[in-house]
Amino acid sequence: MLRFPTCFPSFRVVGEKQLPQEIIFLVWSPKRDLIALANTAGEVLLHRLASFHRVWSFPPNENTGKEVTCLAWRPDGKLLAFALADTKKIVLCDVEKPESLHSFSVEAPVSCMHWMEVTVESSVLTSFYNAEDESNLLLPKLPTLPKNYSNTSKIFSEENSDEIIKLLGDVRLNILVLGGSSGFIELYAYGMFKIARVTGIAGTCLALCLSSDLKSLSVVTEVSTNGASEVSYFQLETNLLYSFLPEVTRMARKFTHISALLQYINLSLTCMCEAWEEILMQMDSRLTKFVQEKNTTTSVQDEFMHLLLWGKASAELQTLLMNQLTVKGLKKLGQSIESSYSSIQKLVISHLQSGSESLLYHLSELKGMASWKQKYEPLGLDAAGIEEAITAVGSFILKANELLQVIDSSMKNFKAFFRWLYVAMLRMTEDHVLPELNKMTQKDITFVAEFLTEHFNEAPDLYNRKGKYFNVERVGQYLKDEDDDLVSPPNTEGNQWYDFLQNSSHLKESPLLFPYYPRKSLHFVKRRMENIIDQCLQKPADVIGKSMNQAICIPLYRDTRSEDSTRRLFKFPFLWNNKTSNLHYLLFTILEDSLYKMCILRRHTDISQSVSNGLIAIKFGSFTYATTEKVRRSIYSCLDAQFYDDETVTVVLKDTVGREGRDRLLVQLPLSLVYNSEDSAEYQFTGTYSTRLDEQCSAIPTRTMHFEKHWRLLESMKAQYVAGNGFRKVSCVLSSNLRHVRVFEMDIDDEWELDESSDEEEEASNKPVKIKEEVLSESEAENQQAGAAALAPEIVIKVEKLDPELDS
């Protein structure tokens, strides 16, 4: 006899795996069949639905961090954000490959995050979304960074790379909301630039959710006192964001452009430093053995100077030149060092200057926006602060041009030195010297002498002991990340323009001229520029943050469970924003008679509006098998629950009297039957929201649910946590040991059958449930459909008021 499965339709297992490390966080991609995991080893893993196959792994490292606390997907599913507690960093990772596209530091360790997308539509926003970014038309494309340098520059090092487009994402505003300890809450536009810092909330954030209409922010916090935790729900008004949404979107888009350009400039400087160190190390490696083996007390500089003046080299220097360096090696070394010098020069011209010019463009546009005070002054955009930032960028460009002149001068000396040394070595080997190489003017000798003076000073303390016998002081001093003045600043004596400015008090203080810092390094001026830009863009975050006022505070419950036993990252509560009906939902459990009863709190995103059935508790009564009409009655405790989609909640239950291995259930709970309009008046909360909810359990209306469909017994698994994804119609269940994962397809055709008669028979035989796949004949299928049609009208779930007899 053919029988239907335990759950109807069946939740089909599509993947199962035992993982080597404990999983502490998992979240489905909003758009694809991918699930991101974080484990106790500090790894971030990406798995595909099919057979739970691993796509990639982002291992822990010193730069990013090793203690992952939470994950969040960008709404388009192209970027994954994760927070690290040990380094207090947020990393944005590409979904295609385990590479950091962007990272930033925060003030406190992040305990939860939420990434939302704005759904509000308006004609102003639509025109902005559809308009082409003018910067793409007016600004040249940023040159790609050379691949042979730091790995951190991958985002800007691919030809025709779309990483920048991936990083900036769609023009439609999306906001990454971060929550941490001591009331730390910050909002980042496009996941990159801070646009709000919320104050006035106490405790550690357990969950948060910014509504898609930008009208309110829901936060759940925990305040620990005397070994127990007070958990409360807050709702904050965010009317400033809602009222000025077009302006916030434009401003935030500019902020992200500026943030990306600052990262580009930083990476360009990193490449320049590496090229400079390459020159140092190449020359040093050639000179180290010579210095260690020479018997004379003369310095390397003296040895070369003696050769320049008298045309004769000491035995040690001759051995170095002829045996260790060789004529061929000298040519190769010269070409290599010239290439490194050229790389620095190219990075300044192509990368620093183009990046700085783009930065000037976006800051100038931002200044124009700030001048429209009616629109942007309420958001805290300050034209004077932006003007100061523009001036700082101008100073940076001046310093970059100064470095170019120094490089050009050093290149002349360098070429003269290597040409002279090449001729000297040819003479030592008595090879023929070409007449054009033999000519050496007094100017050439001066260049060589300058090169020897500048580069062969023994400087053990320079640059963290890099370049002990050879230094590139004139170029390197610009790349030092220190506050010290330049060792050899440029000579401004005789510079007519400089003298003219110094002698003119009007021009000297003119705001039209960029200030010049002749004694400071490029790194110093760059850091100053970054600080000024950060300060001018920080003001909107302060203004918007202060505008977010606490409108509602509901104390939920007192939690005495230890942090170790409940695994902070999976613990209730769970927040959800229904974008269609503009509602905030909060799932949490209250301990009653040693059982955890699930409660659903809902609030309208608009603080001024109320909603019926604002608080309701759910009791799980009976579960009926489809054809045998066998009813499974027991006492169920809610272990975990998450929203599957706007209409359904996925729940993991524990049968408190069931046998181990058959005591966990996976249930789909439709909200349409929880909030039944016909009897909604009977399920009104009669208590007060000012008193802790767990102290007034009797006042919370309880609806008992009886299931005929949409449930499944989780055999041979101590299921504890669940993550659902209504878009892909899948759910992932995690066991209490945090290693065993089982993935279910939730909406499938009725094609699976169960060969069992009842729970009692299975338990008596002590055999596990066996599921087998069978193909129905056409006649059997017709008979089955006819039988189903003859039954009473199809009711998926029976909903009744609390009836003690049913559960006895």
UniProtKB/Swiss-Prot annotation:
Its main location: nucleus. Changing residue 155 to V: In a colorectal cancer sample; somatic mutation. Gene3D superfamilies: YVTN repeat-like/Quinoprotein amine dehydrogenase. The keyword Cell division applies. Keywords: Cell cycle, Cell division, Isopeptide bond, Mitosis, Nucleus, Phosphoprotein, Ubl conjugation, Ubl conjugation pathway. One of its GO terms (molecular function) is ubiquitin-protein transferase activity. It holds the Pfam family WD40_APC4_C-half. InterPro entries: APC4, Apc4-like_WD40_dom, APC4_C, APC4_long_dom, APC4_metazoa, WD40/YVTN_repeat-like_dom_sf, WD40_repeat_dom_sf. GO terms for biological process: anaphase-promoting complex-dependent catabolic process; cell division; protein branched polyubiquitination; protein K11-linked ubiquitination; protein K48-linked ubiquitination; regulation of meiotic cell cycle; regulation of mitotic cell cycle; regulation of mitotic metaphase/anaphase transition. The modification Phosphotyrosine is found at residue 469. One of its GO terms (cellular component) is nucleus. There is a cross-link at residues 772, 798 (Glycyl lysine isopeptide (Lys-Gly) (interchain with G-Cter in SUMO2)). Changing residue 33 to K: Impairs UBE2S-mediated polyubiquitination, decreasing substrate affinity. Does not affect UBE2C-mediated multiubiquitination. Transmembrane segments: none annotated. It is found in: Nucleus. The keyword Lipid metabolism does not apply. Pathway: Protein modification; protein ubiquitination. The modification Phosphoserine is found at residues 757-758, 777, 779. The mammalian APC/C is composed at least of 14 distinct subunits ANAPC1, ANAPC2, CDC27/APC3, ANAPC4, ANAPC5, CDC16/APC6, ANAPC7, CDC23/APC8, ANAPC10, ANAPC11, CDC26/APC12, ANAPC13, ANAPC15 and ANAPC16 that assemble into a complex of at least 19 chains with a combined molecular mass of around 1.2 MDa; APC/C interacts with FZR1 and FBXO5. In the context of the APC/C complex, directly interacts with UBE2S. Interacts with FBXO43. Belongs to the APC4 family. Component of the anaphase promoting complex/cyclosome (APC/C), a cell cycle-regulated E3 ubiquitin ligase that controls progression through mitosis and the G1 phase of the cell cycle. The APC/C complex acts by mediating ubiquitination and subsequent degradation of target proteins: it mainly mediates the formation of 'Lys-11'-linked polyubiquitin chains and, to a lower extent, the formation of 'Lys-48'- and 'Lys-63'-linked polyubiquitin chains. The APC/C complex catalyzes assembly of branched 'Lys-11'-/'Lys-48'-linked branched ubiquitin chains on target proteins. This is Anaphase-promoting complex subunit 4. It comes from Homo sapiens (Human).
